[in-house]
Design a protein with these regions (language model features):
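The feature captures the helix immediately C-terminal to the Walker
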Residues: 16-17
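Hydrophobic anchor at the beta1->P-loop junction of P-loop NTPases
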Residues: 4
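ATP-dependent small-molecule kinase phosphotransfer cores
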Residues: 33-92, 98-99
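Small-molecule kinase domains that catalyze NTP-dependent phosphoryl transfer to phosphate-bearing small molecules
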Residues: 130-179
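P-loop (Walker A) phosphate-binding loop of NTP-binding proteins
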Residues: 7
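Short beta-strand-centered segment that lines the nucleotide-binding/catalytic pocket of NTP-utilizing
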Residues: 24-36
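Walker A/P-loop
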Residues: 12-13
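Conserved phosphate-donor/acceptor-positioning beta-strand/loop module used by diverse small-molecule
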Residues: 91-98, 110-132
Length: 185
């Protein structure tokens, strides 16, 4: 399993799309947040309501979960156990946050997983959030949350990549694919 980890607007989703073009299967995570323009239920995320999410949590259907207090209310995120298990042992990619990584480390053998942190400056993140039209209050909340959530996260990552310009995401995907191939042999 290849895990992409990074702050908001670091380029994780763009990188995941490039890795899928290289033959990776996507592990679709679950959220209660509203869909953004261009997102597709079951492809971008499994979009569900709060009650369904909380029921899945109580019944042990989630391998990991977390929530964020946003300007629009509480949004839950998590990975369903079935989604982590049902794909073949071939190349799989999932985007997780620090809570997800730490939670999975206590539940699943991750010894053959490769965790890649996608790093970029806060200035770059601000520009990207503005370009995609995110609400300024919500953007500030996410930046503040990331400052706390990502403290010391690099220590659990196998590789750290910088994505400041977002112009050569294809090359970055090929590099990660090469490294993953070497890591999984």
């Amino acid at each position: 399993m290849l895990v992409l980890l990074g702050k908001t607007a670091s380029g994780k989703d763009s990188l995941k799309k490039e890795l899928i073009k290289l033959g990776y299967q996507s592990v679709v995570t679950t959220t209660t947040r509203p869909m953004r323009d261009g997102e597709i239920n079951g492809v971008s995320y499994h979009f569900i309501d709060d009650d369904t999410f909380l029921e899945m949590e109580v019944t042990g259907q989630l391998a990991e979960s977390t929530y964020y207090e946003t300007a629009f209310g509480r949004w839950y995120y998590g990975s369903q156990l079935k989604d982590l298990k049902e794909l073949s042992n071939e190349k799989k990619v999932v985007i997780l946050n620090p809570d997800g990584i730490y939670s999975l480390m206590t539940k699943i053998d991750m010894s053959d997983w490769m965790i890649c942190y996608i790093d970029c400056s806060e200035e770059t993140i601000r520009k990207r959030l503005e370009q995609r039209g995110d609400d300024s209050e919500e953007a500030e909340r996410r930046l503040e949350a990331d400052r706390k959530d990502f403290v010391n996260i690099k220590r659990v990552c196998d590789h750290v990549f910088t994505n400041e310009n977002n112009t050569d995401i294809e090359s970055l995907a090929r590099i990660i694919d090469f490294m993953y191939g070497r890591n999984s042999k």
